[in-house]
Amino acid sequence: LEREQLDLFQALPGVVAPRDAQDLMAYPFFSLAKTRRIAPIDFRAGDVAIRVEAMPDHGMATIWDADILIWAASQIVSARDAGLRTSRLMAATPYEMLTFIGRGVSKRDYLRLKAALDRLQSTSVVTSIRQPAEGRRHRFSWINEWQERSGRNGRPLGLELILPDWFYRAVMDDALILTIDRAYFGLTGGLERWLYRLVRKHGGRQRAGWRFDISHLHRKSGSLSPLKRFAFELRDIVRRQPLPGYLLFTEVEAGGRVLLAFEPAPAPVDSVVPSGTRTIVPSGTASSCFREPPSALRHGPETGNRAPNLESNSQSNSLAGKPRTGGGEQKRRCIGRREGAGT
């Protein structure tokens, strides 16, 4: 049995930094809906092929279920960095797992955790990613098996699970792991969760930002929503600006093509700087010196497009290529929490 050949890795106590696997951030491996999904995901881009299949009894593993894999990756990387031995066979309490991913610890939350483990185990993935030869495929489930542990007196001791070798190898490779913002676990929408992971994956490589064709994003997400609905939901995310650490924009090219762009958010600063007096000091204008300065994000048209994203993963970017000539006009909008700032 596989279990007998593996050493047990007990989850580390205390707080560890959340880490995510870049392959899972860049490609459509999970359902973005909270409703049960049975329809498979089929994705191809260059030499990358992915097929995700669900069992009718449980449905496809969701992007919320993937939080368990983020927990596992975080534990393994932290232990490895501390010089401890790790293993694909992991043990932890439901409390440790649930609190790490920002969930409650009620009986209902525990039952949801077990349902998530069932979906992760029953979802089947076939992919060409990180295969040594062209045309080869690797099939696995996100969890090979899991079980509840109990003592001799029947007292529950926690959970054990076995990770697939494909995922474990990615986690053990520093080049394939990124630290993510803990605020990610507070994102409630499936699309915004997927978008944060995609943006975080590319944001670490190009500090000047990134831009995507909306239809390309639609294909890349694996979403079952029609393109029109998908674009509407993206615009709503741009309006709300929920992604920790990043600002989102829509850009409209001269030909009418709509792009989604992002940039790293500026470092937070104090919104009010005391003047050392009890009263508001006039600034020479109708407003006070406490007024928020005009935003650097312009709502009006800009000329010229950004430089193409050539230095990063071309398979994840449908816009890579030679720069456009002629300097066509490009309109840029950022609709966020401070809509109308500086107007």
PLM feature spans:
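Charged, alpha-helix-forming regions
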Residues: 1-342
